[in-house]
């Protein structure tokens, strides 16, 4: 039987929490913080499972459940994301919101949950935001359109180990938007640079490298993202630990394109 108020039932410690959650009908309406009490939250639950539990409670009370983005819940897809007590994805480093567990919190805690805050990420509802601006950046050039041969040819092209490692590290970006949410300028330069760096380090990406950088940076600016001023907040909250050195590479690519 479940036990409350910090005791254990054999399935992790049970928590009683106060949740301060941003509620907003859509991007055109004013939002507000609403407070909810929730009991019997196991420390073995993920953060999203805790929100599921809250929504079950709200539905039983005849109230509107909290809208939030999610999909794989395995830290892979990049769909989930929210500001938790002022931190993108929560208190744990290199962790997505869905992989954050309630053992990171204590009984009696008050947890403040807000959506990503950025002009380019308008609120859809509550904690869910529209991140199609990232897709538009990719559409502007984050791909290879030239012929690169058949599938077997990929294994026949020599790539230096260091270049392959840099490309693989950059390719880990899942497009969650935490970098934008954490940045005081709402800059998307870590995201954009990861996509540019991924392809710039591969031989298949060389033909279009300068055009790619110019087009993706232009799209990023047109979509309303801010510029990078080297605060480093993006790297600090990135769940895949994408490094700011990719931004330096992107700037070099852009300068090359403008010459």
Identify the role of each PLM range:
Residues 45-64, 109-259:
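Ferredoxin-type iron-sulfur electron-transfer modules in oxidoreductases and energy-metabolism complexes
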Residues 34-46:
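Short, contiguous acidic and Ser/Thr-rich linear segments
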Residues 1-20:
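Charged, low-complexity intrinsically disordered regulatory segments in eukaryotic signaling
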Residues 14-36:
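Eukaryote-biased recognition of intrinsically disordered, low-complexity regulatory segments
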């Amino acid at each position: 039987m479940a036990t409350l108020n910090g005791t254990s039932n054999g399935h992790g410690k049970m928590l009683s929490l106060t949740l301060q959650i941003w509620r907003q009908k859509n991007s055109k309406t004013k939002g507000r913080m609403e407070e909810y009490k929730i009991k019997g939250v196991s420390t073995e639950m993920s953060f999203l499972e805790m929100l599921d539990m809250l929504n079950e409670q709200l539905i039983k009370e005849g109230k509107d459940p909290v809208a939030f983005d999610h999909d794989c819940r395995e830290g892979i897809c990049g769909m989930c994301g929210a500001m938790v007590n002022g931190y993108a994805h929560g208190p744990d480093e290199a962790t997505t919101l869905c992989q954050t567990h309630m053992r990171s919190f204590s009984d009696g805690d008050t947890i403040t949950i807000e959506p990503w805050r950025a002009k380019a990420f308008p609120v859809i509802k509550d904690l869910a935001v529209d991140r199609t601006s990232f897709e538009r950046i990719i559409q502007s050039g984050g791909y290879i359109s030239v012929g690169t041969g058949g599938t077997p040819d990929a294994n026949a092209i020599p790539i230096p180990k260091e270049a392959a490692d840099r490309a693989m590290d950059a390719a880990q970006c899942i497009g969650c938007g935490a970098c934008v949410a954490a940045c005081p300028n709402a800059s998307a330069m870590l995201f954009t640079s990861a996509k540019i760096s991924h392809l710039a380090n591969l031989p298949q990406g060389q033909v279009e490298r300068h055009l790619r950088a110019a087009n993706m940076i232009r799209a990023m600016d047109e979509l309303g993202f801010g510029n990078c001023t080297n605060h480093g907040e993006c790297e600090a909250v990135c769940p895949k630990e994408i490094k700011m050195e990719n931004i330096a590479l992107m700037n070099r690519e852009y300068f090359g394109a403008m010459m």
